């Protein structure tokens, strides 16, 4: 009789091709997502070696990082970005890979288009040259980012050399209070364990509060597993998962779907399976959260104040937090509800899905963006944009004064024209608040879509639990 296994154990075991004496394993890869930034050198390596792509049908390419989200008829002005986009178009043509270019309605952020196309499925191993590949773990898949040399290896062999990580489980029980979302859950987790807390582990998210989330909410949580230091994040597939996947363009159909579902249902963690680390949170006690520093672990309640680094005993950590406050232009003791804003960014692979945009529209309908704020909403894909427009969400947002954009990574990172100016302070639904992440000397506060929407209207952070509408 085999020992009880975790969700991660089962997927790992099902994909191991060979194990070396040193413990490293050759892992079969089911799905490979490719974008313009981390793939050019990989494709060039294939050309130099005279190799082909082993499984083009298991690879899907899209442009997202460098595409502009304003008028695309003008083309890409930045020469380096333009070169990367042109290189991807040439590479996918030469190697026979399916590709969504900037004019394809299916185009969007790689971690949004994979799930919505049904390319992402439970039980799969999924890789991409992007750290937020962990997003796909929401489907009960083993998904993680890889480097450019590994991108080349997967293209050539459909395998990857890996060492098995440890198992970690984060259980979130209880019911989320009004105004608290999946984004607040994952920020709370990172605030609890720190940005190194998941190092060397794959996290399985479990518990009543996780099960109650939509697939969009689960993707938000798994997306930021990397910010907690983990290799990947996962949620066991269930009825919510199957309902989302069923009918997607690339998902199995009919009897094939039924057979796949029977396998997916076998993936749940066995009773008594061993976890190397366990963390528990009570959802009922969570407030809306906002980041104050330059690390995703720098989290405080909306009703809290900027912490005082002088209270930190560890000298290195104290100096780090003092540096963060200086960069952010904040003073210890400042109430978060007194922090005013210049910009609001709603989008990214963390919070650029239709559920997120519906929440924002509900928050701002009949209201106006504050005079001191420039606010933009960037749908995560062309299909999300089309659905939002069909529901009238774009009209609500534009009437409120939001800039309604084309899909792409946008202001999540400073690799395209959407950037903060030096010193600007932004409420952002993205995943990283590092120095310069959204533009040189830009100041980023991580929040949920509802918190960002309310901040755009108020011109400062507010407690959305008191929001009417």
UniProtKB/Swiss-Prot annotation:
The keyword Kinase does not apply. Binds 1 [4Fe-4S] cluster per subunit. Pathway: Amino-acid biosynthesis; L-leucine biosynthesis; L-leucine from 3-methyl-2-oxobutanoate: step 2/4. Its cofactor is [4Fe-4S] cluster. Transmembrane segments: none annotated. One of its GO terms (molecular function) is metal ion binding. It is an enzyme of class 4 (lyase). It comes from the Bacteria. PANTHER family: 3-ISOPROPYLMALATE DEHYDRATASE, HOMOACONITASE, MITOCHONDRIAL-RELATED. Catalyzes the isomerization between 2-isopropylmalate and 3-isopropylmalate, via the formation of 2-isopropylmaleate. Heterodimer of LeuC and LeuD. Belongs to the aconitase/IPM isomerase family. LeuC type 1 subfamily. This is 3-isopropylmalate dehydratase large subunit. The gene is leuC.
């Amino acid at each position: 009789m085999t020992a009880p296994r975790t969700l991660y154990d089962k997927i790992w075991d099902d994909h191991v091709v060979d194990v070396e004496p040193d413990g490293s394993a050759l892992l079969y890869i089911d799905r490979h997502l490719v974008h313009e930034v981390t793939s050019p050198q990989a494709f060039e390596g294939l050309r130099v070696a005279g190799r082909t792509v082993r499984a083009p049908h298991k690879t899907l390419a899209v442009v997202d990082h460098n595409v502009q989200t304003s008028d695309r008829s003008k083309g890409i002005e930045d020469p380096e970005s333009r070169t990367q986009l042109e290189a991807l178009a040439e590479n996918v043509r030469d190697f026979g890979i399916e590709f969504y270019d900037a004019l394809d309605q299916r185009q969007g952020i790689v971690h949004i288009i994979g799930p919505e196309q049904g390319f992402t499925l439970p039980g799969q191993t999924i890789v991409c040259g992007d750290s937020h590949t962990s997003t796909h773990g929401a489907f009960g898949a083993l998904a993680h980012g890889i480097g450019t040399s590994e991108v080349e290896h997967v293209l050539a062999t459909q395998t990857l050399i890996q060492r098995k990580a440890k198992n970690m489980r984060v259980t979130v029980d209880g019911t989320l209070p009004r105004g608290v979302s999946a984004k607040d859950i994952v920020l709370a987790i990172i605030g609890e364990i720190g940005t190194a807390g998941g190092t060397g582990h794959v996290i399985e998210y479990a518990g009543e509060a996780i099960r109650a989330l939509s697939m969009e909410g689960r993707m938000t949580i798994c997306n930021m597993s990397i910010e907690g230091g983990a290799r990947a994040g996962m949620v066991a597939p269930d009825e919510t998962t199957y309902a989302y996947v069923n009918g997607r363009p690339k998902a199995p159909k009919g009897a094939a779907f039924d057979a796949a579902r029977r396998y997916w249902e076998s993936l749940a963690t066995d009773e008594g399976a061993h976890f190397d680390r366990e963390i528990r949170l009570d959802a009922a006690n969570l407030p809306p959260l906002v980041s104050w520093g330059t690390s995703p672990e720098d989290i405080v309640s909306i009703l809290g104040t900027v912490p005082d680094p002088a209270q930190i005993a560890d000298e290195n950590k104290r100096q780090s937090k003092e540096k963060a406050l200086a960069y952010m232009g904040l003073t210890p003791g400042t109430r978060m509800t007194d922090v005013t804003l210049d910009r609001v960014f709603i989008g990214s692979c963390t919070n650029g899905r239709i559920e997120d945009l519906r929440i924002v529209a509900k928050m701002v309908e009949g209201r106006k963006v504050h005079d001191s704020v420039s606010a933009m909403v960037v749908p995560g894909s062309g299909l999300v944009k089309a659905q939002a427009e069909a529901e009238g969400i774009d009209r609500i947002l534009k009437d409120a004064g939001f800039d309604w954009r084309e899909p792409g990574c946008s202001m999540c990172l400073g690799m395209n024209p959407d950037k903060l100016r030096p010193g600007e302070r932004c409420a952002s639904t993205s995943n990283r608040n590092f120095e310069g992440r959204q533009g040189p000397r830009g100041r980023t506060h991580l929040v949920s879509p509802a918190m960002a929407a309310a901040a755009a209207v108020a011109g400062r952070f507010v407690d959305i639990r008191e929001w009417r509408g």
